[in-house]
Amino acid sequence: MRTGPLPIAVLAAAAFAQSQSPNQLEAEKTFDRKLAAGANDLFTLDLKSDQMVALKLEDQGTDVILSVYSPDRRLSRAFSSARQKGDALEFLASQPGRWELKVAARERNAPASYKISDLKISNPHAPALQEADVSPRIRKITNQAEADAFWKEIGPNGSPLIEPIKDDPIHRFTTFLWRGSADTQRILLNFRNCSPDPVDCFLHHVEGTDVWYRTLRLDHRLRTTYLLTPNAPALAHGTIVDDDLLSQISVRQQRDPLNPKATIWDSEQNPDLPVHRGSSILEMPDAPPQPWAGKRAGTPAGEIVKQDFASALLKNTRPIFVYLPPGYSINAQPYDLLVVFDGQDSIDIVPTPTTLDNLISEKRIAPTVALIVGNVKEMRGTELPCNPIFAEFLNSELIPWLRPNYNVTRDPQRVTIGGYSYGGLAATCAAYRHPETFGNVLSQSGSYWWTPPPDPSKPDIFTPGADPSYVAQLFVNSPKLPLRFYLDAGSMELDRDGDGSSILVTNRHLRDVLRAKGYEVFYQEFQGAHDYLSWRGTIADGLIPLGGKSAGQTQPGSAQMPRRN
């Protein structure tokens, strides 16, 4: 006959059957209780779905078990006072209704004493806010009538709501909004750097109304994108967002229905509903203009020639696009040359040909031929990250093919190679290896956190941040090369892990190294994230200082002037 401690599951089942009349647990109330041998106590809590319960369970020398039952009387959780050691225990209500908490001694024939205290019930998606972090306009909403007036006031296109902050000229209260319905349980803001803890990115609900909101303090020059996820999975503080959870969030996310400004680069190819195409755009009042990115009536347009190019070195074939400036002639003086990556994206999304049309028309750069190099399917992450074979392909196959077929310069000081993200890294490494061909580097949010793979035969397996100074060290260890640089990075391309591996940190490091070595470097930090929305404008910020010498220009030409040393 067994007389020792019972397993928790068995004990919980017995407790359910033998419970006394229930006690209602109350916040800020302490329960000091004694249990006779074989007895147990029953407590109840009326909870809403996804509410989080926290409380302390302490014993007086004999371990007690607190078992949590959902409204359908299923065992949900079980906690041991001995294991908690005075720390708060937490559980999440998976369904609304009356939950039951049963307390019994682990030793079934032993008496016990225990204490329950510090009960707190909260919504995991609604952490407490300081009053200063709430939109002044939202604070005025206390009932549905006031909410109706608010929605009428801001109109159908009123999100995000942007308000000034007293005594803070740099930031603005920026409030993301959602008009809820009876089915709305929670709304997650998918916004780069909203918070290291995703729980802090849930919108808050103004009780008794259909208003959901999340207010952030954001720079008045910011330009970036965001999405909203209605009825995202419930999260608790410290939740690790793994691939499965990320999928659950991604499948629900959509554009902001209250914001008509959106990135819909693939609208013609994407058959999905409009709300699921692209991302919503946040442009703060003083976001710098992007005067060169849009087509202009009356501005002559260049010609784009497309063909496939087979590489013996890489053993593959890719699309390439050659942009010819307006009035291109084989009898003219050789044209400046721009080489960029990512093919069609660098035509449609980052509008390189349109930008060149506008800059050439305004004589901000010399007439320029552009070679836009396409990607081979699934090979971008292998070819672009500082791959010496890819650099050799550019230098020994692609450029030698281009020169006899098009009227382009052989002077490396009039050749710029550039790209964004991995493209910026590829441009830097290609110029480092072949300065006799590429004299200028235009890097937008270059991925200088990259480190070589430990096994060269497996180029996709590496540890980001293992050596975030790798690219900078190449220039430290080499003589000064005949190169000029434009580098940029976004304020939201931050280092969250403290390992120095972010795009912002590694761009600053490379800038400092290059300047210390005596290189001419144009550098700027824009208020934005790692996305096309900023790169559409900053490509001109790089082309003007790097290509302006040929057109008699020496200073950057946009509202955002890169610093020149």
Identify the meaning behind each predicted range:
Residues 9-18:
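Hydrophobic h-region of N-terminal signal peptides that target proteins for export
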Residues 17-51, 124-126:
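Non-catalytic extracellular/lumenal accessory regions of secreted precursors
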Residues 21-25, 43, 70, 100-129:
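C-terminal edge strands of extracellular/lumenal beta-sandwich accessory domains
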Residues 34-86, 94-97, 102-109:
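Acidic, Ser/Thr/Pro-rich low-complexity intrinsically disordered segments
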Residues 41-43, 87-89, 210-214:
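Short strand-edge motifs at loop-to-beta-strand transitions and within beta-strands
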Residues 46, 90-93, 215-220:
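Short, flexible loop/turn segments at beta-strand junctions in immunoglobulin-like
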Residues 51-53, 62-67, 112-114, 183-187, ...:
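Short beta-strand/loop motifs in extracellular/secreted proteins, especially
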Residues 128-198, 202, 206-565:
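Non-catalytic cap/lid and distal C-terminal segments of serine-dependent acyl enzymes
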